[in-house]
Design a protein with these regions (language model features):
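Segments forming glycine/polar-rich beta-alpha architectures that bind adenosine-containing cofactors
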Residues: 54-107, 175-196
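Extended, charge-enriched "interface" segments that sit outside catalytic cores
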Residues: 96-157
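Catalytic cores of eukaryotic secretory-pathway lumenal/extracellular enzymes that build
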Residues: 244-251
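Short acidic alpha-helix that forms the nucleotide-activated donor recognition element
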Residues: 252-260
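A donor-sugar binding/catalytic signature common to diverse glycosyltransferases
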Residues: 262-307
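Long, charge-rich alpha-helical interaction segments
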Residues: 345-349, 359-362
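Conserved small/polar residues in nucleotide/adenosyl-binding loops
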Residues: 365-370
């Protein structure tokens, strides 16, 4: 086809450029070629033919420049730049959380609607008890609205006074919904073991869709629902934990979820999330971030201050070092931590499903494998 002939010509001219810049470096030519071994590398074509190449968060851009696209960045650094993803406050605050939007306008005027930097004017109310109580009343109203939706759609009664701990996003292993639900199981075990311990009630809310052919992602959704069935129907824990999986997660119910969240779970394996925008939507609606220094979380934490976020886990550099040099040993963790071992064994001992093989593949993470780069 004519289009392929054009790609061949672009490739021919580009290889000449690479040869001129790196004479005799055939390994470099092989790595950077647009067409190699019968395949057209579309990313290479886009970089060569395009005017500008950008990552979608500062960390993501640096990883592209220093790792994934290092050869191209070294040859044509002027093409590379960062454009951190963004959201519009008009959709996810003005439209999605109308009571909070009205409260903000009452306190600082309407300029924030077209210039979000104006929101910083709210800082003067940080110690104003009346303003803070009004803010929390709005949050509680939003939580009541979501609790009503959950009762109607899931048949689960949740306490709007509990902490709404929320993770809603595409289901993927690197986003670590599995880590989240394993933590829920751990807390469930602790409450069962120590019923007298102080524990403020928490409602764990998940929402996600999995790609059609992504079997493991679908298995994780199944696990979340199985855990929910057990936890929500165990009278011995006194309703201290509830688990909800919101079906058909989409923008219309997302707006309600963002407005009601107390905690925003942004726990991807550092270096794997390009940017994320849910992290922005939650923070815009007054839910602090619990997460890793990944994607746009890095810039959010810089903006709001480390003291206003709950950050854990390894850095992107540490994760990449594990990938390059090894050293992550889940077997050691499994063999030396009885509480983690109990959680993992509950996946296959009938606690959450009579089919003891159903979640066995989730245990593959306890054996060293290439997938361990996700550190789930």
């Amino acid at each position: 086809p004519r289009v392929y002939q054009i790609i061949e010509e672009i490739n021919r001219r580009f290889i000449i450029e690479v040869q001129n810049k790196y004479p005799g470096n055939y390994e470099k030519i092989k790595k950077m070629a647009i067409i190699y071994d019968g395949q057209v590398k579309m990313a290479h074509l886009a970089i060569v033919a395009g005017f500008s190449v950008n990552g979608v968060a500062r960390l993501h851009t640096e990883i592209l420049k220093n790792q994934e696209l290092k050869d191209f960045y070294e040859m044509m650094p002027e093409k590379f730049n960062n454009k951190t993803n963004g959201i519009t406050q008009r959709r996810f605050l003005l439209h999605g959380n109308q009571n909070l939007a009205a409260w903000i306008t009452d306190h600082i005027g309407p300029d924030w609607i077209t210039d979000l930097s104006q929101i910083s004017k709210l800082k003067v109310y940080v110690d104003d008890e009346k303003a803070l109580q009004e803010f929390m009343n709005i949050k509680f109203q939003n939580k009541q609205r979501l609790a009503k939706y959950i009762l109607e759609h899931n048949g689960v009664e949740v306490d709007p006074h509990s902490i709404f701990d929320v993770q809603v996003k595409r289901l993927h292993e690197y986003k670590r919904q599995l880590l989240n639900i394993l933590h829920v199981i751990y807390l469930y075990n602790q409450i069962k073991l120590h019923p007298e311990m102080e524990f403020y009630p928490r409602t764990f809310i998940f929402g996600a869709k999995a790609s059609a052919a992504y079997e493991r992602a679908k298995k994780i959704i199944k696990l979340i629902n199985c855990v929910a069935d057990v936890v929500n129907n165990d009278p011995s824990i006194g309703g201290k934990i509830k688990v909800v999986f919101i079906e058909n997660y989409r923008v219309s119910n997302a707006e309600m979820i963002f407005a009601a969240a107390d905690v925003s779970e942004q726990i991807s394996t550092a270096s794997k999330e390009a940017s994320g925008t849910g992290n922005m939507k939650f923070m815009l609606n007054g839910a602090p971030t619990l997460g890793t220094m990944d994607g746009a979380n890095v810039e959010i934490v810089e903006e709001v201050g480390q003291e206003n976020a709950f950050i854990f886990g390894m850095s992107a550099d540490q994760i990449i070092n594990y990938e390059n040099h090894g050293g992550y040993d889940p077997d050691f963790i499994y063999n030396t931590d009885a509480e983690i071992r109990q959680v993992l064994m509950q996946l296959i001992n009938g606690t959450f499903s009579s089919d003891t093989e159903l979640f066995r593949d989730c245990l593959l993470y306890t054996s060293p494998s290439p997938r361990d780069g996700l550190l789930s």
